[in-house]
Amino acid sequence: MAAYTAADVKALREKTGAGMLDCKNALVESEGDVEKAIELLRIKGQKGVAKREDRDASNGLVAVHTDGGLGVMVQLNCETDFVAKSEGFIALSQQVLDQAVAVAATDAESLLASDLGGRTVQELLDEANATMGEKILVPRVARIEGTHVSAYLHRTATDLPPTIGVLVALDAVNDEIGKDVAMHTAAMSPTYLTREDVPAEKVESERRIAEETAREENKPEAAMAKIVEGRVNSYFKDNVLLEQPFAKDPKTTITKLLAGAGVHVTSFARFRAGA
């Protein structure tokens, strides 16, 4: 008679993200002891960690922490949405986020190298990799500060954790505007805050492409400069937050929205899990 039930298998899968057969075998070997089964999965899973290095971690979640004028965001990637929504992976994300806040991490490299209870965060991820049987990464960390920081998390499905996260720093406290701009940023995916933030070489590349395209379209030479400038401005509208049409009211821009509220965005960050 089996020393475990179907509910035990389900619970072990939810805790670890490991495959069903692996969970069954671990429960058999541990004689139904769930904690021992988790340890067995870690030990056996460690052997396959190297093989998982080349696999694609295109799922995951984004977690955020805000406290007044501070915002911290971490991105965790895994291979499948099954693991992404598992209790073990979600708990891991909270551990990583708490550590990012505690050590004031500003990038993934410093966070992964930081000490967490006698081991590094990277070693914690390696253990999770072994237990869950998937490649797990923390590719990005953001830490922004301002007078007020707003956050927004977006779910693509109700049964999955948030996969898009945004932090927006303002120079004044305004929850409504902060939330509106954060939601807009999640939807419209700007790359830069102002056009001055766009690298000069990128602007020159867009200008060159616009001119070459216009010439291929046989646009009149007399109108060339105006056409090129218009297309470069379109690039700014697509990629610069302050110049984008506001998602909730395209007749106004983010700049005008902020001006009407008397606030400024000083910085922002947007992550998408799996990217």
Curated annotation (Swiss-Prot):
Keywords for the protein's UniProt record, in alphabetical order: Cytoplasm, Elongation factor, Protein biosynthesis
Any GO CC annotation of this UniProt entry: cytoplasm
GO molecular function: translation elongation factor activity
Residues covered by region (Involved in Mg(2+) ion dislocation from EF-Tu): 80-83
InterPro entries noted in UniProt: EF-Ts_dimer_sf (IPR036402), Transl_elong_EFTs/EF1B (IPR001816), Transl_elong_EFTs/EF1B_dimer (IPR014039), Transl_elong_Ts_CS (IPR018101), UBA-like_sf (IPR009060)
Localization per record: Cytoplasm
Name of one Pfam family that matches: EF_TS
Family designation: Belongs to the EF-Ts family.
Function, in words: Associates with the EF-Tu.GDP complex and induces the exchange of GDP to GTP. It remains bound to the aminoacyl-tRNA.EF-Tu.GTP complex up to the GTP hydrolysis stage on the ribosome.
Protein name (Swiss-Prot/TrEMBL): Elongation factor Ts
The species this protein was found in: Kineococcus radiotolerans (strain ATCC BAA-149 / DSM 14245 / SRS30216)
